Amino acid sequence: MNNIQVAIIEDEKPAARLLEGMIKKLRPQWDIIKIPGSIESSVAWFASHPHPDIVFLDIQLSDGNSFLFIEQACPTSLIIFTTAYDEYAVRAFTVNSIDYLLKPIRQERLEEAIQKFEHVTSKYNQKLLEQNDLLEVL
């Protein structure tokens, strides 16, 4: 999968750099965007830019809980949560989330989450192609 746009929303710069490095190691062809790790900045960014394909989202941001960001920004992106807190896992799957990574993130778990994203998007793209084929027949 090429031309995948990835956003990292993380308020701790060392954690953001570490996650970026891990993603680049696994998928060097992906474009990574680091968005400031606050709800306010993230909502503003999403209001003025095309939404990326996937967002790695920390749950506790500098100005609150990332579920508020989701309510305000309504991202169309698939979300992989990255957090040190396991108590939000159930709620995470009520939004556009496909995985939940506990910090410290292990490379193997990140690879599993990325593969899940790739599987979901390939199935979605396959369905779109099938629908387009049906429309052409009509």
What would you call each of these model-derived segments?
Residues 1-5:
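Non-catalytic signal-transmission and effector/linker regions of two-component phosphorelay proteins
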Residues 7, 33-34, 80:
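Conserved beta-strand positions in the Rossmann-like core of class I SAM-dependent methyltransferases
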Residues 10:
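Conserved acidic carboxylate
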Residues 17-21, 25:
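Charged docking surfaces used in two-component/phosphorelay signaling
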Residues 20, 35-54:
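Acidic, metal-coordinating helix/loop segments flanking the phosphotransfer/catalytic sites
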Residues 27-33, 77:
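A generic structural motif
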Residues 44, 52-135:
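CheY-like receiver
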